[in-house]
Amino acid sequence: MGKGVGRDKYEPAAVSEHGDKKKAKKERDMDELKKEVSMDDHKLSLDELHRKYGTDLSRGLTPARAAEILARDGPNALTPPPTTPEWVKFCRQLFGGFSMLLWIGAILCFLAYGIQAATEEEPQNDNLYLGVVLSAVVIITGCFSYYQEAKSSKIMESFKNMVPQQALVIRNGEKMSINAEEVVVGDLVEVKGGDRIPADLRIISANGCKVDNSSLTGESEPQTRSPDFTNENPLETRNIAFFSTNCVEGTARGIVVYTGDRTVMGRIATLASGLEGGQTPIAAEIEHFIHIITGVAVFLGVSFFILSLILEYTWLEAVIFLIGIIVANVPEGLLATVTVCLTLTAKRMARKNCLVKNLEAVETLGSTSTICSDKTGTLTQNRMTVAHMWSDNQIHEADTTENQSGVSFDKTSATWLALSRIAGLCNRAVFQANQENLPILKRAVAGDASESALLKCIELCCGSVKEMRERYTKIVEIPFNSTNKYQLSIHKNPNTAEPRHLLVMKGAPERILDRCSSILIHGKEQPLDEELKDAFQNAYLELGGLGERVLGFCHLFLPDEQFPEGFQFDTDDVNFPLDNLCFVGLISMIDPPRAAVPDAVGKCRSAGIKVIMVTGDHPITAKAIAKGVGIISEGNETVEDIAARLNIPVSQVNPRDAKACVVHGSDLKDMTSEQLDDILKYHTEIVFARTSPQQKLIIVEGCQRQGAIVAVTGDGVNDSPASKKADIGVAMGIAGSDVSKQAADMILLDDNFASIVTGVEEGRLIFDNLKKSIAYTLTSNIPEITPFLIFIIANIPLPLGTVTILCIDLGTDMVPAISLAYEQAESDIMKRQPRNPKTDKLVNEQLISMAYGQIGMIQALGGFFTYFVILAENGFLPIHLLGLRVNWDDRWINDVEDSYGQQWTYEQRKIVEFTCHTPFFVTIVVVQWADLVICKTRRNSVFQQGMKNKILIFGLFEETALAAFLSYCPGMGVALRMYPLKPTWWFCAFPYSLLIFVYDEVRKLIIRRRPGGWVEKETYY
């Protein structure tokens, strides 16, 4: 944290270029931020503090000095994260990835039209129309995607309420409330319960002060703050309070040591906003796909350009061919299909409580192979709950379920009544007003987490605590402090059969036991002998080992003769007994796991996803929760477990024998990257405890080095750098801090880890369905492009026009392609390993070979069959067509003879040609029926999957209706050059459609019968 600490170590050798310098500086700054928090203010004595900051420790700074510092350091505010200007976002949608390919297509069309317009007297307008339509497609889908993202980002308009509005400072001995942005380094600040800490403070005096650091360190318990230096690590010491955490109770004074971006919170926010998010896997896939399509298009275009020149076409004609082939290869409708598919999934996920901020993140979640999850609030319920009691020398289990449906215990025992009385009276937590109608567990409580847990437990078991406190009036109390480690209060006893005053005490179990000489067993006091002390010790160790926070409880009836009615109890100079008390029992609390989490973790495991817990909490608690939710599965041991079982020192155990592993933050700090890689590689079940935000980031980078796609979940500010660095960051909608929501790609509206698993399933499904959509869309490229190629090579009249191609890509194929996004998952979706982004591509060789090489070729054969049938019916036999093109297209020749010697004028010839375009188009529609049905599944038979997808059935009818409309609607001959066709011509394609269906069903059958065989390797996409 020190300004400029260790800068010199990082100075690179003279960097020549300005750009390199900038990059080097950015990397250096990031390294600087990734280092652990370095500050030494917590080690300084008050004198040294006074010397360092020039502050009078009782009167504060002078207003003049404060103004100077404010001018030097700037306001005490976080720099808002850099936002991308809206026009840049819009341009990204218009010119990114796939759109670029369509723009190139459009420009080439305009170019071709320009060439034709310059060289022909009456140029055809096909290319002009095509260029206009392509531009329109890009602009419309671009606007659509931009609108989607803008809608999501509106939900994210926060971060502003991170900064506290007012702060109480002491300047020149006067208390004044000022805007928190005007607080400067060296200011003397006072905070009380309920305030937000306005800057990083070094505490110089405190009274019962506790702060909630959960958003920074992930610890759910409020932390005591005092002037004492208690730990080398500034995040753990008691005498530093951090900017933007909350003071829960008590009061404190402190000197401001850092403000704004230099605070610990500021560094984390800067760290998060400075990280490069990187490209999403689906964006990389689409880029890879564009490379393939562009490669194929350019290769074919150039090959046929050269071929045309060899076949003695003019170079102008050759250029027109080149452009035609490239454009025919571009699947115009696919950009819209992909955008719509992702949007549909995002909407479906929002219904399941996952809000996706970035459309492409939908798929990323599906390819996730490692989830680094925060513990508090994500895996657990984020409410301390009483878990166990130890009284009458036995452990009782309490009900920790969210809906109180679990086990209960005997509530009539005299010891339990005494224990519940102490827990209710020696407790400062109270329910907030007007909540009588709410269930007890849902009520808001003023007080710390442990006391709230006790309050709710006693209210559930024994009725109103408020009434109990009214009956037993409180006379005096000594609040909990870190030196004594106990809390004590004395109450009037309404029960006349017992002494008038009851002293109750709770605190750290070993401290409480030391003050006791007897113990309550079945309502009777017994001397506390060694045997009972051992029983206590065993119970304490057992509950502590479960990761629970244990408190001890004792009481004492004060004898009436020494403490008569009206006795003045003095808590400063204590005039009542604090020893020889009667020990009543232990109560332990834990933040229990959420009910749905163990099942979700199990699903992750069967889907091949590794779940790693990363928490700021204590290792024992972390390990207990990890075992509770199945992150460490039953029977798997850590190195410590093996050492305990074999009764040998930990150092003698081979770490690789242990499948599970709990790593402490302090050990992680000293590890090299190689050691961390070793842990991540050789242990399947890992828990990182007591980690700092910087370490979370290092863990994520370690997982990414292993080639994992990492999802990070968390709700605190401490999770945001890791969340930003991960492939997908998941923030909590309810408990999440604004900084973490800012950095995330997805927000769980119900804060439940189980929703992530739903997300993973949806992500995998969308990847499968996108593959199916692409396979469907690409297949029709072959029957669209082969007519063009045969037209050039064999010199026959053009079988299919450019405008007709557009009618397929943007008309008949659109709805069916989108309908595949609604297809249900195949049975193996959550049983297979996560996809490997390096090898499992969205568009792979197998998909191209199936779409282009096999199904596409059958479709093209069907098209040509129809074409030759119709021309033969009109008198032109196939053999007669070869080499006919030059005369056919010459508008000055009006006596071209057919196979039977009839003469055809230019106009008549063109009508026959366009009449052929329409059946060729209809044939493609008919064979695409079969293609759509076979694309429903990749491995299962269509008969297994069924036809439950209503949108797909609608798609089949829609494409048929559209084809019929385009063929038979009056005026289409002029607009699109489509002519009505005889009903019999529809049936030419049926055998080919059936062939496609049978061929693919047989292929899938072989894949299922012979997994891993040749057919699967070559054709399973």
Swiss-Prot record:
Residues bound to Mg(2+): D715, D719
Transmembrane segments: 86-106, 130-150, 287-306, 319-336, 771-790, 801-821, 842-864, 917-936, 950-968, 984-1004
UniProt keyword annotation of Hydrolase present: no
Topology term for the membrane: Multi-pass membrane protein
UniProt xrefs under SUPFAM superfamilies: Calcium ATPase, transduction domain A (SSF81653), Calcium ATPase, transmembrane domain M (SSF81665), HAD-like (SSF56784), Metal cation-transporting ATPase, ATP-binding domain N (SSF81660)
Modified residues (Phosphoserine): S16, S38, S45, S226, S450, S482, S666, S673, S941
SMART domains in alphabetical order: Cation_ATPase_N
Gene Ontology terms for molecular function: ATP binding; ATP hydrolysis activity; ATPase binding; P-type sodium:potassium-exchanging transporter activity; potassium ion binding; sodium ion binding
Ranges for region Mediates interaction with SCN7A: 594-715
Ranges facing Cytoplasmic side: 6-85, 151-286, 337-770, 822-841, 937-949, 1005-1021
Positions of the propeptide segment: 1-5
Keywords assigned by UniProt, alphabetized: Acetylation, ATP-binding, Cell membrane, Cell projection, Ion transport, Magnesium, Membrane, Metal-binding, Nucleotide-binding, Phosphoprotein, Potassium, Potassium transport, Sodium, Sodium transport, Sodium/potassium transport, Translocase, Transmembrane, Transmembrane helix, Transport
Ranges for region Phosphoinositide-3 kinase binding: 80-82
Residue numbers carrying Phosphotyrosine: Y10, Y258, Y540
Summary of the function given for this chain in its UniProt record: This is the catalytic component of the active enzyme, which catalyzes the hydrolysis of ATP coupled with the exchange of sodium and potassium ions across the plasma membrane. This action creates the electrochemical gradient of sodium and potassium ions, providing the energy for active transport of various nutrients. Could also be part of an osmosensory signaling pathway that senses body-fluid sodium levels and controls salt intake behavior as well as voluntary water intake to regulate sodium homeostasis.
Record protein name field: Sodium/potassium-transporting ATPase subunit alpha-1
Source organism: Sus scrofa
